[in-house]
Amino acid sequence: MNILSHSGPFALFFAFAIAHALADFPLQGDYLARMKCRSQASMPSEWIISLTAHSLVQAGGVWIVSGSALLGATELCLHWLIDLGKGEGKFGYVTDQLLHLACKLAYVIVLVLGIVAV
């Protein structure tokens, strides 16, 4: 069961956006925000673990909101890649956030169309 079955697509997107904001700001903390970037970490394992930990928190939010472990796993991978791109200087903060929200919109579409069962 997910929010879609109770309130519709807009409420589902809104819930995804709230979960994203919580995981990207208060739940991330200064340490993960810095250490998930390769240039800030003192050893390779530090940035990989930090980026993965942050992406797992994001994945948990998607799983909780959608009820789909598959979408949660998808978020883990996509969030990891998007934040890697930002950390490597491929794009900035605004593009990073727009890409994350585009993923959430894609999850809503997939759920509305019934492509992923929950």
Model-derived features: where do they sit?
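Interhelical loop and helix-boundary elements at the membrane-water interface
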Residues: I3, F16-Q58, L76, W80-L111, ...
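A metal-dependent hydrolase signature that marks the N-terminal structural subdomain at the beginning
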Residues: M1-S7, A11
